[in-house]
């Protein structure tokens, strides 16, 4: 069974709200770098980057981060007959002494974010990393907490939260899927 918990209108309002929060927290946007975790986190990062540009007139540097080889659960993610494919980052941007705005679609156990933090070290030593999560569903296994949250959605472990984006799904919405 599937229930739409965020429709397109709410999706775009959430992007706008998070963008406003980032601007309000940082008077100087010059030291910010936007990092989106591939795949849907990167698309959400692009939406936030464009909204910040629209609101502030400032275009922030950004990269799409592939965390494939930093994961601790590859044997569970990839089929046994298939080797993982690493696509790398979209480009190299140094994050040395910058504030990184790390963006992903869903925060669940925290393991994806841990992998992203490990991958981020390859781009330099950031002054600070702030985490943006579109949907926080709880059930953390690691001590990770988001600085900006689009929506908190309490779930059972058997439920699934699916953030759908235009590039991958042809729409902007969030679905709660019960088994």
UniProtKB/Swiss-Prot annotation:
Gene Ontology MF, one: uracil phosphoribosyltransferase activity
Gene3D superfamilies: 3.40.50.2020
Keywords: Glycosyltransferase, Transcription, Transcription regulation, Transferase
Reaction catalysis annotation: UMP + diphosphate = 5-phospho-alpha-D-ribose 1-diphosphate + uracil
UniProt motif PRPP-binding: location: 100-112
BP GO annotations: regulation of DNA-templated transcription
Disulfide bonding pattern of the chain: none
Catalytic EC class: transferase
SUPFAM superfamilies: PRTase-like
Entry EC number(s): 2.4.2.9
UniProt cross-references to InterPro entries, sorted A to Z: PRibTrfase_dom (IPR000836), PRTase-like (IPR029057), PyrR (IPR023050), PyrR_bifunctional (IPR050137)
Pfam families: Pribosyltran (PF00156)
Statement: the UniProt record of this protein carries the keyword Hydrolase: no
Family: Belongs to the purine/pyrimidine phosphoribosyltransferase family. PyrR subfamily.
HAMAP family documented for this protein: PyrR (MF_01219)
NCBIfam families according to UniProt: PRK05205.1-5 (NF003549)
Function: Regulates the transcription of the pyrimidine nucleotide (pyr) operon in response to exogenous pyrimidines. Also displays a weak uracil phosphoribosyltransferase activity which is not physiologically significant.
Official protein name in the record: Bifunctional protein PyrR
Provenance organism: Mannheimia succiniciproducens (strain KCTC 0769BP / MBEL55E)
Lineage start: Bacteria, Pseudomonadati, Pseudomonadota, Gammaproteobacteria, Pasteurellales
């Amino acid at each position: 069974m599937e229930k739409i918990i965020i429709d397109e209108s709410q999706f775009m309002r959430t992007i706008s709200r998070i963008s406003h929060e980032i601007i309000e927290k940082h008077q100087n946007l010059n030291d910010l770098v936007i990092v989106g975790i591939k795949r849907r986190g990167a698309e959400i990062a692009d939406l936030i980057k464009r909204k910040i540009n629209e609101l502030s007139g400032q275009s922030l540097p950004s990269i799409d981060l592939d965390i494939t080889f930093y994961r601790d659960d590859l044997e569970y993610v990839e089929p046994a007959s298939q080797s993982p494919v690493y696509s790398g980052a979209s480009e190299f941007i140094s994050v040395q002494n910058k504030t990184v705005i790390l963006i992903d679609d869903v925060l669940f156990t925290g393991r994806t974010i841990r992998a992203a933090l490990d991958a981020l070290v390859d781009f330099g030593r950031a002054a600070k990393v702030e985490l943006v999560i579109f949907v926080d569903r709880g059930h953390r296994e690691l001590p990770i907490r988001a600085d900006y949250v689009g929506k908190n959605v309490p779930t059972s472990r058997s439920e699934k939260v699916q953030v759908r984006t235009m590039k991958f799904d042809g729409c902007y919405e969030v679905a709660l899927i019960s088994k």
